[in-house]
Amino acid sequence: MSSIEEVHYKLRQDSPLYYDVYYSTGGVSNIGGGSDVWVRHWIEEIAPKLNKPFYLLIDRNRLETDKDVGIQAIYRNHPDFHTILDNTEKIHILHGYYEPTKIILDNADKIETNIMHCTLYKSLRAHHDLGLSWLKHFKSDFSWESKMLDVAKKTIWIGLSDTDYHKDYDIIDIPNFYEFKGDSKAVESNTVGFCSRMETRKAPHFLEDIPSYFFTRVDHFQEWRKKLNLKFNKSKLYQYRWEKLKKFLQRDDWGISHSAHIYEPFGYSIFQAVDYGKIPIISEDWLHEIEYPFRASTKEKFEECWKQICELDTNQRQGYIDYLRDKLNRYTNKKEWVDKYLEIYNS
């Protein structure tokens, strides 16, 4: 018996009679976006405290680049993947696909909870709202979003503001959290940093005429240039790698963050900017209750905000950063976040 066969045999022998399934599409070792960060937090903070036997199923094939992260993950190309699904009574979706998925359709009656990470009804119209002729978005089906709201016994929203669905569904609000770990010391540079995926609602085209650094996927950057005839002549491109994110954030040659992403559910890039001393330009639709002058939802307004920030000295920038950090401290309680989920998962 090969070593792989031995692992599979042991899994079958050790399988509990009753168990929950936690289902995800990513977040194990390859971190690409906010939903992956959420799943990683679940793995590190919630999974060890669950009081019921469970399996973590990842609905994609395991790659050679995938690494173990302290918890056993069963990938789609594992021979027991479908058997585990068939024999469970409860499925908790940590992060699912944004279009109809056979596995979910076949097990719809078992969906206990579903984590809602974004609002498709908004993000799929982002190109219209930004005046663009092209939409860059991950594969998705608008109708699937409402279908999942109907199917899941409990829907949990990770964002900071209510969605339109809150009017018709009993949605549980558990906002994400962020732990400030940097010194938030203002950086004087006027170069703008963009640390995000280049989907349309992130509005990367705002930086067309501004000195800037992109920390993102090279192929997506090139796609934007080709589809919308953008030059980005004043921009430098750095290939995104999760393990290099902190180093990029710590650089002192960019001091302003392009965080003006419309329809932002939580806003990791805003928290990161504040954490590492980059004064952020944020969208006009994010946390209205915070009074902040540097908000933009158009390219022209973004350029205006950038010019205004360029006129600020370091002390003035520090004042805005300290102000935002104080306002955002309400979303830094990791224990509260963990406890709210455990109350649901362990009930």
Predicted segments, located by residue:
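Nucleotide-sugar-dependent
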Residues: 256-270, 283-292
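A charged, aromatic-enriched C-terminal amphipathic alpha-helix characteristic of glycosyltransferases
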Residues: 37, 297-303, 311-347
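Conserved donor-binding/catalytic core segment of Leloir-type glycosyltransferases
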Residues: 19, 183-202, 208-213
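Short hydrophobic beta-strand element within catalytic cores of glycosyltransferases
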Residues: 275-283
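Short N-terminal targeting/anchoring amphipathic segment
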Residues: 17, 69-103, 113-116, 254-257
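Conserved active-site histidine-acidic residue motif and adjacent donor-binding/catalytic loop
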Residues: 218, 227-250
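Short beta-strand->alpha-helix junction loop in the catalytic core
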Residues: 122-123, 161-164, 172-184, 219-221, ...
